[in-house]
């Protein structure tokens, strides 16, 4: 049943992507660069803290934003298949948990003007559901809710997001490569519609338990943004720490 559900969702997303892209190509686009550092600290096999430090820069206008994200997650649930693999945001091969619950807080400000152009505070909650397949293929569903306070007057709104992720690990001696693709529609309460869709393709590579590098190309289509079509190059440095207890 779950395998059939994943196949149906995948086919629907592929059809949605094809229909969306056909109406996009003729429109103007903007390009951005997104460098990021992610710090991970695992203190038990199931519990983990992390901090993201992402930046964004518009190549044409030079506009920049910076964010700080602090979050905690808890992995739980065993698959009927015993799966030992390195996932996108993991430092080493471990027995995979099929569910993950995450919560965190984000602060974003425009840079160079002390947040006068844009400022946001956001509390978010995530649920991840993972389905492993043969040949180290993994299909994940992520449901996320964002509670947002935007601007000087802290105007409240919320978003609901669903992300479908497909990834696969390849190993060669100590090197682990995890290519992936994902698609994510956003529902925004300010517009009472699905106004944004993101398509991402990339890979994560690691050859040591402490460091991993991730690179991806992101395309974003937003019908209610000042920039309707956005292309971004996202480069992420993952740095991992863990206690002795977490390694058991």
Q: Where are these predicted regions, by residue range?
A:
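Residues that define the transmembrane beta-barrel architecture of outer-membrane proteins
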Residues: 31-33, 64-68, 119-123, 154-160, ...
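Transmembrane beta-strands of outer-membrane beta-barrel pores
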Residues: 53-59, 105-111, 131, 145-149, ...
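Outer-membrane beta-barrel "beta-signal"
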Residues: 71-75, 79, 127, 229-248
């Amino acid at each position: 049943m779950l395998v059939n559900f994943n196949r149906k969702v995948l086919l629907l997303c592929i059809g949605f992507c094809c229909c969306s892209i056909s109406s996009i190509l003729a429109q103007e686009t903007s390009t951005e660069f997104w460098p990021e550092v992610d710090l991970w600290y695992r203190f038990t096999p199931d519990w983990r803290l992390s901090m993201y430090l992402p930046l964004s820069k518009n190549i044409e206008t030079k506009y920049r934003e910076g964010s700080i994200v602090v979050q905690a997650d808890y992995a739980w649930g065993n698959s009927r298949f015993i799966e030992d693999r390195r996932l996108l945001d993991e430092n080493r091969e471990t027995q995979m948990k099929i569910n993950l619950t995450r919560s965190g807080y984000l602060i974003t400000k425009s840079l160079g003007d002390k947040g006068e152009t844009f400022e946001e505070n956001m509390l978010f909650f995530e649920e991840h559901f993972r389905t492993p397949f043969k040949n180290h293929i993994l299909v994940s569903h992520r449901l996320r809710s964002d509670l947002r306070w935007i601007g000087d007057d802290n105007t409240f709104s919320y978003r609901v997001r669903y992300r479908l992720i497909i990834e696969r690990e390849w190993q060669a001696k100590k090197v682990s490569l995890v290519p992936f693709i994902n698609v994510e529609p956003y529902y925004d309460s300010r517009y009472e519609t699905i106004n944004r869709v993101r398509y991402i393709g990339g890979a994560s590579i690691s050859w040591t338990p402490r460091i991993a590098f991730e690179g991806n190309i992101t395309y974003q289509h937003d019908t209610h943004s000042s920039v309707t079509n956005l292309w971004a190059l996202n480069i992420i440095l993952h740095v991992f720490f863990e206690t002795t207890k977490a390694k058991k």
